[in-house]
Amino acid sequence: REVSPIATDYVKAQEGETSSSAVTLSLIRDTTNDYIFPSKGTKATVSVTHAGGPLEGDANYTQYGASLFAYFPLPLDVVFAAKGRIGYIQDHEGVEIPVSNRYVLGGINSLRGFRYVGPTNGGTSDVIGGTNMMVFNVELVLPFIKESGMKLVAFYDAGNSWDNKYDMGDLRQSVGAGIRWYSPIGPLRLEYGHVLDRGELNDDSKGRWEFTIGMPM
């Protein structure tokens, strides 16, 4: 792949074409009452992904992940949602895990308000991602225009990615609000995240608007 000419040597070393082959095994238990906008129940997932080895390719690692989403109905059709995800990537035979396969958080599906979150390289602002990650999301979803399938959401996000550790005292945080619409072309989300701790290098903005077509994370 192409990289910026001002990127660090670590990132430049991964320029060019690479290939990887991986297989994923997932176990999911879903008791939620709706596939798009659930209001009660839980969804638990554990997964293992292996790349390289007999599958060949340039990458050689095993990735472990787990998540738990819980939804609780409240009066007036309000829904409280609590979500947590954790992940770990283990390299094999000393093969460096490519930046594209490491955990880089930020954006509407992890830490809203941030562009990129994760370990940087050489004291620069180049986020190269981590081998461990943890994300927590808390949401309050309120009906807005029931006939049109529109909802309002207020949220709090916390999480980070690290190299070879988890640090609960080092979580990036944001709060925000948005609107969700189950439109004829699918679920639409427009949300603004305000960064509570801007950090030293990872992200200079105070927050950002984000839009996506698809299911909530």
PLM regions: where:
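C-terminal beta-signal and terminal closure region of outer-membrane beta-barrel proteins
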Residues: 166-217
